A protein has these predicted regions:
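Disulfide-rich, cysteine-dense extracellular ectodomains and adjacent flexible linkers of secreted
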Residues: 1-201
Length: 201
């Protein structure tokens, strides 16, 4: 109460506080603090993932998506740093979120991760790169955490393949995950594509 002869006192305004008895004035919440209620004796530190850059604030401001801030009581947007490659964040993040299996991100400050391309995989969280399927393996879908072995009677002879190829006429194999097929032996023949056996003459 800042006037004499009064019959009551005034509540501190939102964004302000009074922390002593008999006060004639209210004080604004300082940088890095805020409150949104009247009649308060203190202010609240900005939460992790947020900041308050004005005095007398009734709100805290979330860090932008793609950034994070692990500290309480921050008073500037510069306290929000870019999330590292291999991670992402939404608004108001206190920590980066790692890219999940099947996804990756090779740039910092991002709001999401990319699916692994077909013919590729990502088998760890927080990855900054995707890996092509190796010889004898393939996949034809995005966002995968692994590749599939080629079926018996088929092969994959290139890295990053989205398809498997059937063994041609005169060739065969009876194992999965192969990068080539075997010519039929003398005295045998193979007259179908994708064969897992050879036939004696």
């Amino acid at each position: 109460q800042n006037q004499s002869g009064q019959t009551g006192c005034m509540n501190a305004s939102a964004g302000h506080y009074v922390d002593t008895n008999g006060s004639t004035m209210q004080a604004p919440c300082g940088l890095g603090t805020w409150n949104n209620m009247t009649g308060q004796s203190s202010c609240t530190n900005a939460s992790a993932g947020h900041y308050v850059d004005t005095n007398g604030s009734t709100t805290q401001t979330p860090c932008d998506a793609g950034t994070y801030n692990p500290s309480n009581g921050s008073n500037s947007s510069s306290d929000c740093g870019d999330v590292p490659a291999g991670s992402f964040s939404g608004p108001g993040a206190s920590s980066p979120t790692p890219c999940s299996i099947g996804t990756w991100q090779n740039q910092s400050g991002q709001t999401g991760c990319m699916n692994a391309s077909a013919g590729h995989y990502v088998d760890t969280n927080g990855s900054t790169m995707q890996t092509p399927c190796g010889l004898g393996t393939w996949n034809n879908m995005t966002g995968q955490g692994s590749c599939t072995n080629s079926s018996a009677g088929h092969y994959v002879d290139t890295n990053g393949s989205t398809t498997q190829t059937p063994c041609g006429l005169g060739t065969w194999n009876n194992m999965t995950g192969q990068s080539s097929c075997t010519n039929s032996s003398a005295g045998y023949y193979v007259d179908t594509n994708g064969s897992t056996t050879q036939t004696p003459c």
